[in-house]
Amino acid sequence: MAGVSIWEDEKMSEHARWQGRYAVPDYIFGEEPNAFLAAQKHLLPTGGKALAVADGEARNGVWLAQQGLDVTSIDFSSNAQDKARALAKSRGVNITLECVDVHAWPYPENTFDVVVEIFTQFSTPEERTLKWDGMIRCLKPGGLLLLEGYTPKQLEYKTGGPKEIERLYTRSMLEKGFAKLARFEIKEYDTHMSEGAGHAGMAAVIDLIGYK
């Protein structure tokens, strides 16, 4: 396309790819929350504001709303957010949906009690830094940050996630990326996933639970 940089063309292609994936009737990652997220229910505050980053069809954002949180769900796919809207309605909850580039969103300072990022590994290393810095910035002091992603070992399983190793998460990457948090813990393990067609089978994952 004349006048469009290679980087911009790649971004548009990524957007088109996800728009296409989300155009199917089924929820590609299922309608239930991510297992790691659901297992942290006991850590959630009673009330407050939550941000779900690159939330797609909002299975996680809707679940957070069901726990009594005021949820903002951001994603760049309008097709995904159409399905998110329908899922929220079917569960009897309201969430705020913003169709945006998660790397360019302002992440307002000290706004959210909970910030969640689950399997959003489409960012370049530079974009990832912007996104993670924003996630930390918008978290209130004492707020909870929950993250799950695939590790490089996931390339052996071939059951989902990116094929580019630089987009997969390592312990040292998370330790550096979230060093500004007051405290955090990281766990790596293999698990069997059953979260829609998009996350099915054995997987190599890494989790972070942190507080600002």
Description of each model-found segment:
Residues 103-114:
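A short acidic, Gly/Pro-enriched loop at the edge of an enzyme's catalytic core
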Residues 166-186:
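Short alpha-helix
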Residues 142-150:
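Conserved beta-strand signature within the Rossmann-like core of class I S-adenosyl-L-methionine
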Residues 3-45, 47-56, 153:
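Conserved class I S-adenosyl-L-methionine
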Residues 77-79:
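Conserved SAM/SAH-binding beta-strand->alpha-helix loop
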Residues 122-135:
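A short, conserved alpha-helix within the catalytic core of class I
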Residues 91-103:
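Conserved SAM-binding strand-loop segment of SAM-dependent methyltransferases
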